[in-house]
Amino acid sequence: MIGLKQLSDTLLNEASSLAQLRDALNAFTQRCSDVGGILPDRSFNAWAGDALLKNGVAISPAAAAHCVNDTQRSVVFIRAVYAAIKAAQARFAQGPVEILYAGCGPFATLLLPLLGRFEAGELTVHLLDIHQRSLDSVDLLISDFGLQAHHISCTQGDACDYQHPSHPHVIIAETMQKSLEQEPQFAVTANLAPQLHPQGIFIPQQIEVDLCLAKLNEETAAVKRGDTLDSDALIAAGQRHRLATALCLIPAQAATLQQQASQNNAGLLELNPMHLRMPTTADLSDFEPALFTRVQAFEQHQLIDYEWLMVHGSWLKGARQGPRGRIGWFA
């Protein structure tokens, strides 16, 4: 049975192989499932126990547990969280560092493996999730991993409108699907970022969604073969055309972007439509409009095209091809 020291040593070690990282996360998942009683399930569908919120979908505890299996995503964010906490300790030397982890899921994956590296009293941790079942699981894990001496509280609530009583030094909010299409990452960021301490750290620091014309079938096939794709090289070779940055979500600007959004007939917020002119010098018959999501979790800890399951290129819904080669896209 894996312990927190062995787990965090493996996950934070840049020399760990992909197989070692995967094995460590699998062992963590198995222990968490055995203790908390929640088995990972990738069933992202209407019967999965998801919570339908006004600002998106809060996936079920079982689906959230399955996200641990996205190895690169989990490792990059865990390393980012550790680096952010160490940076916060340097900034707020009087301590303790206050952390709010929104959408923690049943395993608190991005933080729990790290807590054993800190002394009790160094951190004050607030865990927030819409599902009480997830919080019940985390509570069992805190006891099982021997973390009772740490200052950890659990709150059931919607991160889209949750109001924290203080200004945390670190906020972790990783509640996204590809291209931010379902889970409420945008609304969560817009609500929580203004509550951050002025010198605090928000994770992720930036999410960028690029609108491109791409040969998605070819790119996906190449990735499945094990090829490494370089977006800049694809663009230089004319195999992908970058049209625009559809969205750049920076925590400090999220609330303003939300205020500028309009409400559609269904009562949902929509960003302003984009109208783009298609390239005229290339044969575009084999290309399709697609969105690519890139994430800067913290400083050098980043996820780019095809490095993780949620940022694979996604076919663009809501694209309208208009006269003179223009595309109108509605977020």
What do these predicted ranges mean?
Residues 138-139:
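Conserved SAM-binding loop
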Residues 66-81, 103-110, 130-134, 181:
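Phosphate/oxyanion-binding active-site loops and adjacent basic polyanion-contact surfaces
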